[in-house]
Amino acid sequence: MQRAREAEMMKSQVLFPFLLSLFCGAISQQIRYTIPEELANGSRVGKLAKDLGLSVRELPTRKLRVSAEDYFNVSLESGDLLVNGRIDREKICGRKLECALEFETVAENPMNVFHVVVVIQDINDNAPRFVAKGIDLEICESALPGVKFSLDSAQDADVEGNSLKLYTINPNQYFSLSTKESPDGSKYPVLLLEKPLDREHQSSHRLILTAMDGGDPPLSGTTHIWIRVTDANDNAPVFSQEVYRVSLQENVPWGTSVLRVMATDQDEGINAEITYAFLNSPISTSLFNLNPNTGDITTNGTLDFEETSRYVLSVEAKDGGVHTAHCNVQIEIVDENDNAPEVTFMSFSNQIPEDSDLGTVIALIKVRDKDSGQNGMVTCYTQEEVPFKLESTSKNYYKLVIAGALNREQTADYNVTIIATDKGKPALSSRTSITLHISDINDNAPVFHQASYVVHVSENNPPGASIAQVSASDPDLGPNGRVSYSILASDLEPRELLSYVSVSPQSGVVFAQRAFDHEQLRAFELTLQARDQGSPALSANVSLRVLVGDLNDNAPRVLYPALGPDGSALFDMVPRAAEPGYLVTKVVAVDADSGHNAWLSYHVLQASEPGLFSLGLRTGEVRTARALGDRDAARQRLLVAVRDGGQPPLSATATLHLIFADSLQEVLPDLSDRPEPSDPQTELQFYLVVALALISVLFLLAVILAIALRLRRSSSLDTEGCFQTGLCSKSGPGVPPNHSEGTLPYSYNLCIASHSAKTEFNSLNLTPEMAPPQDLLCDDPSMVVCASNEDHKIAYDPSLSSHQAPPNTDWRFSQAQRPGTSGSQNGDDTGTWPNNQFDTEMLQAMILASASEAADGSSTLGGGAGTMGLSARYGPQFTLQHVPDYRQNVYIPGSNATLTNAAGKRDGKAPAGGNGNKKKSGKKEKK
């Protein structure tokens, strides 16, 4: 099959040049593509038809084809050049750096020939491969470290970066591996002996050789190295002399040749290779050097006749095996003047306090020169400008003393170089340097980095957050320079200081212990202290001013109009003839924040009649924008929003109820129709009062029943007479009541305020024209209780005793409307306020029920002659003036008696109750 394909390619190679010669005029420009090798069959190489300028529709008629059909073909559907066979760069181009397939593309009708070049890029698809499965080596155990062995290289078909890069072996203690490059560029491994082999210990070694290429990821190949250790050595080395003698001047330069020792071995090869070494002589190895291969001995140090005048060296010669030989080398040293002075410290103080006095001895120094005569006379001095000096005490003795003031903060250490010079020619000298450490004393107080600190902290900060950091430095050392921080004083209360801030003693970080509130605390100042740990301790103080920044955390609060329990504003009255610009009222609000956060603006959110009123953006003034029209309602409602200038802004709302009226009488019906908001606190008080009233009624009924039973047993009483002032009984059948009827003359005045929606009674005054009742009858079956006092009596209709009228719903009071004590009343009041809460609430119920009847015009206690009048006032406070003691004349809720007058009952009018069904006034009905 392969041969047939090759024959076909040969035929194509012959045919296409022939065609090219025929149609050379039709050859177009060259087209070039680049692809990686080993692309899968069917992979697109390029858009051949498009690059040739051919459309896909004409491909079937043009019969587009390529000459390299073993590798490529043309798709007639898309016109793409596709891979038709395996493209192996290594097989096609071998190790050429550039690999390209060149072929021709032929199109017919008309005939055109195009030259196409496909460059094949190398990929790392070939791992390094060793030809041999293993490598065998034989190494004698006498082989010296450093011996190299070249090994067979591996083969990698890839090129350039994907080719073979390096060799490695598994770690071991005897061998290492390096990679070498041959002149042709190929790389081969070299095995290096790192440690002598011992056949008796290990006769063979097995290594794994790995070859790695430079691809990403890299590919590798391995093979085994088998090393066999051989042993053959039967002759010992022999020195030419047993003792070698030589003379040498002292102070000769290093590396000076002394002599050469020589030994021979009759063996051949590796067994005849001899190495030399000093034998158990530390002095020899420190002053002399022996070449292990040649036997040359050279100087390796300074030879001093004054120290040693003669050296004896023992030398050992060893062949490649285990045989050795020994000889001695005697070296005589010739004396010269070669000794420099020596400086020795007899005593030395390394730590010097910085407050030491002048003249304090720091060190005692001894100088010595091994030479004699002038060469042995020595002088000493210091080299640098230091606050120390040398003073001679005796021959060859000096002392180092303090010659200037010491300051550790400026210079903590001194390097003092002492030079000793003899008087020889040429003079020899020596230098000795010592380091003197200046010890610290606590002579510096901490210094803050700033004269004062000012920090800005936003309110509502998280507790525990750091708000500032103070920093102080102390140039002293150790505890003398270790600074701790504390709060010394503050303009806050001492009890509150720890609850506001704290400071870290180590870092000086000031922490907020609580969330600050700009509205409560806008700024405060702390006095912080930095204190070192010296003895005595030194300290410094600094002020820290904390400015608490404002956040928009407070919504505006509406002061006027005052809000009712349901959050709505109260009524304001506007004249019907009010001109445009008439000031109706003013919304007053405050914001606890500051700055822009407290800059308030007023906006109308909702209006019953848009355009009727205008609202001042900054003033909050409500003015009429136009005159009241005929179609405008008399009652108007404005929903006003008050916004601050914060980001984001906060707001509050207020509701204004406005009534257009020219007189107070027009306002009352509107106020009566207004449902009162439910107050949970008022309802609770109402329930308590009702419960107390029921208990009291039950108790009174029990007392009355007991008295009635006792009276029935008494036979001495007249059945038709009254046995008490206010209590009568009859045993006969019911007789129409025979009593006088009358009215109690009272007058009432109504006052209305724009901020109140309740009818509150200012005073209850008894007119002097009150006529006393003529007589009082008590019906026995109904057991009506008639309450009376010494001066006045109120008659009750016994026919209505079984139909109790409910109290008006207005009788309950809020906490702000509770009647005050006598301290808030006039001192000349003739009446007495009830002295307990129960009586007080009963009186309040009676007054409010009467006020409700007076407000809607249906009250039986009218304002005419001979009637009881009430004075009511609308306002935020409820006060009673000139209230006589009516506790004996007042109806108690829960009883069968109803507060009324005879005229009201004759007319068939029911008293005003709590059901809220009140009649409108006459003026209201006309409307």
UniProtKB/Swiss-Prot annotation:
Glycans are attached at N41, N73, N300, N415, N541. Residues 29-130, 131-239, 240-343, 344-448, 449-558, 566-671 form the Cadherin domain. Pfam families: Cadherin, Cadherin_2, Cadherin_C_2, Cadherin_tail. Keywords: Calcium, Cell adhesion, Cell membrane, Glycoprotein, Membrane, Repeat, Signal, Transmembrane, Transmembrane helix. Residues 797-836, 897-927 are annotated as: Disordered. It is found in: Cell membrane. Residues 917-927 have a biased composition (Basic residues). Potential calcium-dependent cell-adhesion protein. May be involved in the establishment and maintenance of specific neuronal connections in the brain. This is Protocadherin gamma-B1. The lineage of its organism: Eukaryota, Metazoa, Chordata, Craniata, Vertebrata. The gene is PCDHGB1.
